[in-house]
Structure formats: structure tokens, C-alpha cells
């Protein structure tokens, strides 16, 4: 695909931002990652609790849940902490539920045993795509947490059934483009977030037109872009997980 339109970043239409996945970013959590999609930076941690929610008690399976938040100055202007306001926004609740659903799609929760894997995604700098970066980084953090369960003999086999990652796509200046940054996201005609597994299955597709409806052909082009982008992200996840721990 050629760069037939001028993206604010100068990237090709099918070009991801620079993606970095840094494991063992903090020392206390069983799994921790700094994930960077260009200037979007998210700390993802995975913590193990030897208990399950009440609705799963005595059912012999585990649970995975996620929380998401942004530092007050992660964006251009400071926002109040949600804890100070005493209430999470609808956006925050939507995103953390999405992260949880995405990761649960590749977990056999019975193999996890009667324990909970808590995923925390904290955005330290936002430039578009925070939810997709969170999912991509959180999977690696969860993988490291599971590795510790295996290493200590607390589980016999991995509950992880596949990889999962996410990316944004959109129609910008009439052209389908991959991995929207803030400037593109705020000006695009269509914005879509796509979550996929390593096997190529779709976990979630969130698509919205902004003023101009998109066609079936445009949707197919966006999904093709997303699929290629997610394949690249999963390759980066695998490369990060192959690196030896210090």
C-alpha cells in the first residue's frame, strides 16, 4: 500500500508506530511490562491472588479481571484522578472490560485453578491507541505471571491457549490507515479497534463512523489492515517473551 495521503506522522498507510515491549518493568508484580506504541506508553502489570470472586467460589476455576486508568497528566491537559472524583468514567469502565474480555478469550480458566489474575493497565502518556496498547502489553505481563505459577508448581500446565493483541485502524482523508495516533484519531472519518488471536480469530471489533458512513469495502480493507498489524504485534510479543530474564 502506498502513502496516497499525508498522515500527520508521515507514516505509510499500513505502517505501525514504533512498538516496544519491555518486560520486568517493575519488581513486585508477577508480570510487568512497559508497552510503547509510539508516544503512547502504558505500564501493564499482572498480579496473582489466591482467591476468586464469590460467583466462582467452589467451582474449581479461576478468573481474570482488568483495571485501566490514566495518570492525571498523561494527556495534553491535566485531568483529575478518578479516585478523587469518587467515580470511574464510562470510558474507563468500557476499556477495562474490553481488556478483561480480550485476555479471557485466550485463557482456560479451569487450568488457572481457584485464583485470580489481576491485570492493571496504567497509561503514563497518551497519544492515541491506549486500549490497544494495553491489551497487547497486558498479554505479555499475564504470560510472565503464568510462567511464575508454572515455575513454582502451583499449576501443572499453562492456561494460555493462544496469543492476543489489538490495534486501531481508521479512514483518514479517505484512505484506510493503521494504528491511529491522537492527531489522526481526532480527525478521521472512521475509527475502529480490533482485537484478534494468534490463530486469526476476531475477539472484538469496535467501529464508529464520524460524520461520514463507511462502506463494506472500506470495512473489509480496515480489517485486512488490522489483521496484518496484529500479526506484526504478535511477532513482537513472541520476540519479547523469548528474551532471557535478567
From Swiss-Prot:
Transmembrane segments: none annotated. The keyword Iron does not apply. GO terms for molecular function: 3'-5'-RNA exonuclease activity; tRNA binding; tRNA nucleotidyltransferase activity. It catalyses: tRNA(n+1) + phosphate = tRNA(n) + a ribonucleoside 5'-diphosphate. Its EC number is 2.7.7.56. Keywords: Nucleotidyltransferase, RNA-binding, rRNA processing, Transferase, tRNA processing, tRNA-binding. InterPro entries: ExoRNase_PH_dom1, ExoRNase_PH_dom2, ExoRNase_PH_dom2_sf, PNPase/RNase_PH_dom_sf, Ribosomal_Su5_D2-typ_SF, RNase_PH, RNase_PH_bac-type, RNase_PH_CS. The keyword tRNA processing applies. Phosphate binds at residues 91, 129-131. Gene3D superfamilies: GHMP Kinase, N-terminal domain. It comes from the Bacteria. GO terms for biological process: rRNA catabolic process; rRNA processing; tRNA processing. Pfam families: RNase_PH (PF01138), RNase_PH_C (PF03725). Phosphorolytic 3'-5' exoribonuclease that plays an important role in tRNA 3'-end maturation. Removes nucleotide residues following the 3'-CCA terminus of tRNAs; can also add nucleotides to the ends of RNA molecules by using nucleoside diphosphates as substrates, but this may not be physiologically important. Probably plays a role in initiation of 16S rRNA degradation (leading to ribosome degradation) during starvation. NCBIfam families: RNasePH. Homohexameric ring arranged as a trimer of dimers. Belongs to the RNase PH family. This is Ribonuclease PH. It comes from Paraburkholderia phytofirmans (strain DSM 17436 / LMG 22146 / PsJN). The gene is rph.
Amino acid at each position: 500500500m502506498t502513502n496516497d495521503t499525508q498522515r500527520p506522522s508521515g507514516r505509510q498507510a499500513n505502517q505501525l508506530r514504533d512498538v516496544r515491549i519491555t518486560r520486568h518493568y517493575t519488581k513486585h508484580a508477577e508480570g510487568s511490562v512497559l508497552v510503547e506504541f509510539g508516544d503512547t506508553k502504558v505500564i501493564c502489570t499482572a498480579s496473582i491472588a489466591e482467591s476468586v470472586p464469590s460467583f466462582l467460589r467452589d467451582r474449581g476455576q479461576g478468573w481474570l479481571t482488568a483495571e485501566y486508568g490514566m495518570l492525571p497528566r498523561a494527556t495534553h491537559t491535566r485531568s483529575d484522578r478518578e479516585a478523587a472524583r469518587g467515580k470511574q468514567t464510562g470510558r474507563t469502565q468500557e476499556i477495562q472490560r474490553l481488556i478483561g474480555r480480550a485476555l479471557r478469550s485466550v485463557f482456560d480458566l479451569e487450568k488457572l485453578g481457584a485464583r485470580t489474575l489481576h491485570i492493571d493497565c496504567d497509561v503514563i502518556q497518551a497519544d492515541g491507541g491506549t486500549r490497544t496498547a494495553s491489551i497487547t502489553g497486558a498479554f505479555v505481563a499475564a504470560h510472565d505471571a503464568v510462567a511464575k505459577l508454572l515455575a513454582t508448581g502451583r499449576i501443572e500446565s499453562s492456561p494460555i491457549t493462544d496469543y492476543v493483541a489489538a490495534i486501531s485502524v481508521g479512514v483518514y482523508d479517505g484512505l484506510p490507515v493503521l494504528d491511529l495516533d491522537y492527531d489522526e484519531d481526532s480527525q478521521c472519518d472512521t475509527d475502529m479497534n480490533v482485537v484478534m488471536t494468534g490463530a486469526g480469530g476476531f475477539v472484538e471489533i469496535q467501529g464508529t463512523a464520524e460524520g461520514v458512513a463507511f462502506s463494506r469495502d472500506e470495512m473489509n480493507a480496515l480489517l485486512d489492515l488490522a489483521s496484518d498489524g496484529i500479526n506484526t504485534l504478535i511477532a513482537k510479543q513472541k520476540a519479547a517473551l523469548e528474551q532471557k530474564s535478567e
